[in-house]
Amino acid sequence: MPGSEDVYERLLASVKVLTAHARARGVRFLIENHPLSTIAGHEGRRLLPMVTSDELCRLLVDVGDPGFGVLIDVGHLNISAHALGFDRVQFVKTLAPFIGGFHLSDNDGIVDQHRPFGRDAWFMPLLRDCPRAPVTIELSRARTDEILQTRDAVADSL
């Protein structure tokens, strides 16, 4: 994780408070994976935490509360996997027991474009590994027919 251990400890303390707050209201607290792009313009420095499955697993273990989980943004994941060279599918499989939801969109692996996708999208088979996780389709500048085709692709995969 970028930054000092102090940054992580502050994040951990905040997540514990937010998880307890959510649990008291009958909901889970989820944290979304961040994207890391090769074009971020930060001279190769990582400015955001929670990009890799190792970082997310560490936080999950340290929080140690079933009321805390992860929300996988597959667009962010595609960008980070492209930038860091890790396996996207293994990332999801590693975190599957903790996944509380998905944000679904397609992109070129460099920029988070929120493009429509079809039944053949790389992440579609993985949705079956987390059948209770809600999905949100995130599209930008999509035509109505693209939105409906994307919706149907997701419905068919569940």
Language-model segments: what does each one mean?
Residues 1, 41, 53-158:
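Histidine-acidic metal/acid-base catalytic patches
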Residues 1-70, 79:
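Active-site acidic/histidine proton-transfer and metal-coordination neighborhood
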